[in-house]
């Protein structure tokens, strides 16, 4: 068993790259506000968290705070679960490394997101960043640090998704840039050089591989004590008629 940092990304359907934030994949936002699927997932996540009482970090997109339905739900969740912390998943869900380098644009977005999320989350806020959809290039590292963040958890160090690592497609270059910028890096867990987090939890074979990796995880700790980091999507809790849960040794 290995100490692990549990994290959850709160993207709604309107945030996925096929809807927004990618120069070639996005086809337009399908809906505004909290989707029906997200509402169902939120209810199931509430039930799961009330039962397990685990400590985890939620990486929130700052524009979600503008949605009163989501904001009220998250505020209530944080009040009931003081063990939950909040990190930044961007101002919007823009996949920055898929676009030409724009340090000024990224800095402005990160500062605005930091202020917005910090004011909302209060004591639960942490200066931790996760790039939308895991798109992070080396040029982004010093900007993330300049915006006041201390830890980054964007790297998915698998060859299968190296296109997200900027023009060099090199995760080692991203990791080196994070280190040189003074940022603590917490990459996501891989097994057999394959992803085990996020979408990998529901893709055939990758899901089998992920379950094999996750069953060896625990206890659940903060990122500075963790040997591994995993994440899943809040939307996942709407799967299997609301009965889905992460493949952790909790029961």
Which residue ranges define each predicted feature?
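Alpha-helical packing segments of well-folded alpha/beta enzyme cores
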Residues: 38-48, 109-117, 140, 213, ...
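Active-site beta->alpha N-cap acidic-glycine motif
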Residues: 1-79, 234-235, 242-250
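Metal-dependent polysaccharide deacetylase catalytic core of the NodB/CE4 family, i.e.
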Residues: 54-137, 161
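Structural preference for beta-strand elements that scaffold enzyme active sites
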Residues: 3-7, 55-59, 83-87, 126-128, ...
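Short acidic/His/Gly/Ser-rich catalytic and metal-binding motifs that mark active-site loops
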Residues: 13-18, 95-96, 195
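Conserved phosphate-coordination/catalytic loops
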Residues: 32-40, 104-108, 205-208
């Amino acid at each position: 068993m290995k100490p692990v940092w549990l994290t959850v990304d709160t993207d709604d359907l309107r945030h996925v790259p096929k809807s927004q934030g990618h120069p070639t994949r996005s086809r337009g936002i399908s809906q505004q506000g909290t989707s029906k699927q997200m509402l169902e997932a939120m209810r199931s996540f509430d039930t799961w968290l009330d039962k397990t009482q685990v400590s985890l970090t939620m990486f929130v997109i700052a524009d979600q705070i503008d949605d009163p339905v989501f904001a009220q739900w998250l505020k209530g969740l944080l009040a009931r679960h003081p063990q939950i912390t909040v990190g930044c998943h961007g101002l919007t869900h823009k996949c920055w490394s898929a676009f030409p380098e724009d340090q000024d644009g990224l800095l402005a977005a990160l500062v605005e997101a930091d202020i917005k999320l910090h004011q909302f989350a209060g004591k639960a806020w942490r200066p931790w960043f996760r790039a939308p959809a895991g798109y992070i290039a080396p040029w982004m590292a010093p900007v993330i640090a300049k915006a006041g963040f201390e830890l980054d958890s964007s790297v998915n160090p698998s060859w299968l998704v190296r296109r997200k690592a900027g023009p060099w497609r090199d995760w080692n270059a991203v990791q080196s840039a994070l280190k040189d910028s003074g940022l603590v890096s917490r990459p996501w867990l891989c097994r057999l050089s394959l992803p085990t987090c996020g979408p990998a939890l529901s893709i055939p074979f990758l899901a089998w591989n992920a379950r094999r990796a996750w069953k060896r995880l625990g206890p659940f700790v903060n990122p500075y004590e963790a040997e591994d980091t995993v994440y899943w999507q809040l939307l996942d809790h709407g799967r299997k008629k609301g009965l889905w849960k992460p493949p952790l040794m909790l029961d």
